[in-house]
């Protein structure tokens, strides 16, 4: 993480430049696309039972309720090295097997245009009786 090295066994590492991924998961509620940091949540290796208890709160951004094994950092560069040959990395829905992964925020930015009042940092809310059953 930038110049800091953390050596441990991890069950999960989520690098977030936005709030949501994969069907509404929000691992780091404070992640923003426009703040210049890569919110990186590291979850230490835990037993299956503990991990299953963690998934619900993780999906809602409540990792902070588990400080013994979940910490969030805000680096600009993340390098992950694994001694195991079968580490699976998912990047925007694409899975790759690799031992070394480096993720860095780009200095180059993209401008997005949207309707008035639209923000990449807001949460969409369903309104109306026909949307309540989604």
Each language-model region and where it sits:
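Long C-terminal subdomains/extensions of small-metabolite kinases
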Residues: 1-134
